[in-house]
Amino acid sequence: MHSQQSRRSQIGNRGLLVLFLAIFVVMMGFGIVLPVLQFYARSVGATPLEIGLLATSYAFMQFLFAPLWGGLSDRIGRKPVFSIGLIGYAVSFVIFGLSHQVWQLFLARILGGVLSAATLPTAMAYIGDTTSEDRRGGGMGMMGAAMGLGFTIGPGIGGLLGRHNLSLPFFVGAALALVTLILSWGALPEPVRHPSSAERPSRIDAFRLALGGPLAYYFVVTLVAAFALAALEATYALFAQDRLHLSSTSGAGAIGVVFVIVGLVQAAILGGLVGRLINRWGEERLVRAGLVLAAIGYLLVTGTHNIATLAIYAAVAGAGHALMRPSVASLISKRTPGGQGLSIGIMDSFDSLGRILGPAWGGWVYHAGITLPYVSAAAALALTVGVSFSAAARGVPAHAGSE
């Protein structure tokens, strides 16, 4: 028993380092395409609604297939499934970069959503296999840091590459995915798997339990916040191009800078500030503050007329989300007497649902007015805050019954 634990620890130390590098590289590759994706899709002839549906189709495929890949990794191993996800990133990026028709863009995004859904769930399962309970939080934190670092650096690189050629970031992203594949296959040890024997409820049952439980308000907050953010992300490049009169190449560079600034602000908040604020003010106040700050940021974006103010206002909205999401996760974890993993998993499902609905909504209302995605997102966040204060005024806390 002791030798097995020792081997598990050795694999864990080495595996976490390799996994950190792998997630960082693949997320940097994913981040590289973000500043140019909407510009490229518009150059092919996609409408704002179709651009929104591209994001929706990708998120929907990930929502459907992530649990399936996770189950498959329990049976055949973490490395093979993780590798399938990396191949999916590479192939889908290449197809997207070579596309000249809208249906080809959808093919690339749907295929990418199906296959890339194998990556992050398998990485999380790998951490569970190779860390003890007291080290698991640190392992998950490392993965979050790798993702955040990749997302911060990637868009800046993508914006620079996009200034020369809108297809180039997709090919660089594909190359980085293949580099990650080689790195992980050669250096990532296959762990001893510890699949759970507990029967898990279906997603439909999980949603029903969540909406009927004492934490329903915070699951709805997660859904609305993800919806609002996804509606913004699905149209931000179109808005910058139409409002600021940017070309596709100059717009890609400008949006890359915006992403980097927002990423740095969020990293500063998530890197330690949010924990101190939670200890001082509590999760509930921070959730409300984050929702209000994000709503203000969205409304400010509608009045921007240069890239500097767009970056500042987007950073305000990003700061609101950075305050809110960890506060919701902390509150749900603390107020769940058992099965925290299931509760956080349900929270992630609500987040995924918001990311499915938000882009389609953003692309649809963009036709009616380029500021409507942001105004409607701010209204949804404000309504969520209003529900919280209304419940408190009636003496019914949003978490009633949870203690």
Name each model feature, range by range.
Residues 2-13, 189-220, 403:
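Juxtamembrane intracellular "pre-TM" segments in multi-pass secondary transporters
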Residues 45, 77, 98-104, 115, ...:
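Helix-breaking motifs and short loop linkers at transmembrane-helix boundaries and internal kinks
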